UniProtKB/Swiss-Prot annotation:
InterPro entries: Domain_X (IPR024937), Maturase_MatK (IPR002866), Maturase_MatK_N (IPR024942)
Family note: Belongs to the intron maturase 2 family. MatK subfamily.
GO molecular function: RNA binding
Keywords for the protein's UniProt record, in alphabetical order: Chloroplast, mRNA processing, Plastid, RNA-binding, tRNA processing
Main location: plastid
HAMAP family for the chain: MatK (MF_01390)
Any one of the GO CC terms: chloroplast
Biological function: Usually encoded in the trnK tRNA gene intron. Probably assists in splicing its own and other chloroplast group II introns.
Alphabetized PANTHER family for the sequence: MATURASE K
Protein name: Maturase K
UniProt GO BP: mRNA processing; RNA splicing; tRNA processing
Location relative to the cell: Plastid, Chloroplast
Length: 515
């Protein structure tokens, strides 16, 4: 494998590399066996690991011999060594062979993704959720419309195999992949008769399929957008106030010297910006309504003809930023004008000018969050707190920790909003629900619980925002911070409540299109 990486700099080597002989190397299955045991030991206790979870090279050689026969290539999902102690649908050796298949396919994919990203100087790769928030502040104010799309999950297995053939010319190495995909497609549990490519499946094989599928979609989409655009990419540089500098070079006029006539080439950047969080890409566009409709139509046709998928119209929605829209993960978005007073002194004269800039204003969706809290039995539909009966069997510390975790996630995720008053209503619901849960556990009232526990009741919980402001701001700065947006950098993933709320919004959009 190191030889593949060393030779990957050659343009055609990674396309013509022969991967099929790697399937018959015993070292590959030893590596996959170790990785599988690491994942299994982290998800299962040690007492559930039996002696059958040991690698036998005799069984591996038997599997390799069966893989050599084309008629028995479907052996990847056959119970070769069943383990009665583990309640799993696939055998231990089937998982090991599947891990080995993933390791082989990851070699050319890693080389291709590495050198394709290095060759794209004008584009930047967003690899973390933390890059979404600078994108909202830096890119969105320059756009007047956004396209909220959803990557389709269901795809035919033969389409995946054909896309692999574009950069792997070793056809025999794709036979095991085709066998795995069709076996999964024909399984009794799969009612859609297609491959479900989702990023939440915690297996290395499906995570690899998801990364490859998304990378293929984005690479083809970016190349088409680059060809359709007649303007070259303009970088704004790294300045403290990149927003204003970006506005200055928005329109550049170049006069042609070759023609005596006054031919003008306008480098008018169409302002198409792209970011993706999970399976939801966002495309911010600055242009007329006709341009937005063309981009939306292009995305639908692109999916239909390139991946041979029928894409429902509700999977690509367009919104205007002048109105409230639910396009960002868990936020209502709107653009507001922010006036800035600029004083310029030249010699003895002082000039005062008002500079008006557009600024994105994410709004906390209070009503949907209350609805989700009501679904999770923290309050009723009107927002009245109730006790969490399913948590009464836990200890007091566990109850406080769970409520504290929910509030900390909500506060950190929505701290970038200007108007954070609605968050304190959520805090009131969670704190009173916590008190009622403790009172229900001890079979008493809220007053008795507060009297017995005293100030220790909420000393540990619901105090993260006070610690944050006291550690980082003085009194004046803390007051100013209420008018400024602060993005926390300890958000590991998108808030689960935001995902649930986004699913509800998607169902509403689907119902509108059905009507």
């Amino acid at each position: 494998m190191d030889e593949f990486h060393r030779c990957g700099k050659e343009d055609s080597f990674w396309q013509q590399c022969f991967l099929y002989p790697l399937f018959f190397q015993e070292d590959l299955y030893a590596i996959s066996h170790d990785h599988y045991l690491d994942v299994s030991s982290s998800s299962r206790p040690m007492e559930h690991l039996s002696s059958n979870d040991q690698l036998s090279f005799l069984t591996v050689k038997r599997l390799i011999g069966q893989i050599r026969q084309q008629n028995n290539s479907i052996v990847l999902f056959v119970n070769c060594d069943p383990n009665p102690l583990a309640d799993r649908k696939k055998s231990f050796y089937s998982e090991s062979v599947l891990e080995a298949l993933t390791l082989v396919l990851e070699v050319p994919f890693s080389i291709w993704s590495k050198y394709s990203v290095e060759g794209m100087n004008e584009s930047k790769s967003f690899r973390s959720i933390h890059s979404i928030f600078p994108f909202l502040e830096d890119k969105f104010p320059h756009s007047n419309s956004i396209l909220d799309a959803r990557i389709p999950y269901y795809i035919h297995p033969e389409i995946l195999v054909r896309t692999f053939r574009r950069w792997i010319r070793d056809a025999p190495s794709l036979h095991p992949l085709r066998s795995v995909l069709y076996e999964y497609r024909n399984s009794p549990d799969n009612l859609q008769r297609s491959i479900i490519v989702v990023p939440r499946v915690n297996t290395r094989f499906f995570l690899f399929l998801w990364n490859y599928y998304v990378c293929e979609c984005e690479s083809i989409l970016f190349s088409r957008l680059k060809r359709s655009s007649h303007s070259r990419s303009l970088t704004h540089g790294s300045l403290p106030q990149r927003t204003h500098f970006h506005r200055k070079i928005k329109h550049i006029i170049i006069f042609s010297r070759r023609n005596s006539l006054k031919s003008i080439w306008s480098l008018k950047d169409p302002k198409i910006h792209y970011v993706r969080y999970g399976e939801r890409p966002i495309i911010a566009i600055k242009g007329a309504h006709l341009l937005v409709k063309k981009c939306r139509y292009y995305l639908l046709i692109f999916r239909q003809f390139y991946f041979h998928l029928w894409s429902e119209p509700y999977r690509v929605c367009s919104h205007q930023l002048s109105k409230n829209c639910s396009s960002s993960p868990g936020y209502f978005l709107r653009v507001r004008m922010n006036p800035i007073l600029v004083r310029t002194k030249m010699l003895d004269e002082l000039f005062i000018a008002d500079l008006i800039t557009d600024e994105i204003d994410p709004i906390v969706p209070i009503v949907p969050i209350i609805g989700l809290l009501a679904t999770e039995k923290f309050c009723d539909i009107s927002g009245r707190p109730i006790s969490k009966l399913s948590w009464t069997s836990l200890t007091d510390d566990d109850i406080l920790d769970r409520f504290d975790q929910i509030w900390r996630n909500l506060f950190h995720y929505y701290s970038g909003s200007f108007d954070r008053d609605g968050l304190y209503r959520i805090k009131y619901i969670l704190s009173l629900s916590c008190a009622k849960t403790l009172a229900c556990k001890h079979k008493s009232t809220i007053r008795v619980v507060r009297k017995e526990l005293g100030p220790e009741l909420f000393k540990k919980s619901f105090s993260k925002e006070r610690e944050f402001y006291s550690l980082r701001f003085s009194s004046k700065a803390a007051a100013r911070s209420q008018r400024e947006r602060i993005w926390h950098s300890d958000i590991p993933q998108i808030n689960p409540l935001a995902n649930s709320w986004q699913k509800i919004q998607d169902l509403k959009i689907e119902n509108l299109f059905d009507q």
